[in-house]
């Protein structure tokens, strides 16, 4: 459950998704995640690095093999999410 706790934190999945697209430094990653504060980004990067999902090399964050495996494991959820959004207009009931 610790992994689900980490992934449920605000911006964690977005960071993983962005780094799956390509490695990025802190400022570039903050630019890609437009509304994320630098303090939240710093915290999430530390948590994801501590969980061995990311590493920092040559001033760029990138997914580790564990991080790549995680993103691949989440692919079916991403596909389901796209179908759900198409069918519902992306609006949650409430």
Where are these regions (language model features)?
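Short beta-strand "wing" residues that participate in macromolecule-binding interfaces
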Residues: 56
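Amphipathic alpha-helical dimerization/coiled-coil segments
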Residues: 62, 71-94
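Short, hydrophobic-biased segments on the C-terminal half of alpha helices
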Residues: 45-46
């Amino acid at each position: 459950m610790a992994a689900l706790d980490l992934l449920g934190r605000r911006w964690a999945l977005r960071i993983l998704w962005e780094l799956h697209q390509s490695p990025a430094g802190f400022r570039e990653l903050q630019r890609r995640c437009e509304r994320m504060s630098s303090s939240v980004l710093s915290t999430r990067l530390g948590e994801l690095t501590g969980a061995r999902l990311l590493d920092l090399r040559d001033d760029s964050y990138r997914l580790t093999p564990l991080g790549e495996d995680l993103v691949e494991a989440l692919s079916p959820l991403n596909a389901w999410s796209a179908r759900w959004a198409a069918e519902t207009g992306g609006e949650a009931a409430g």
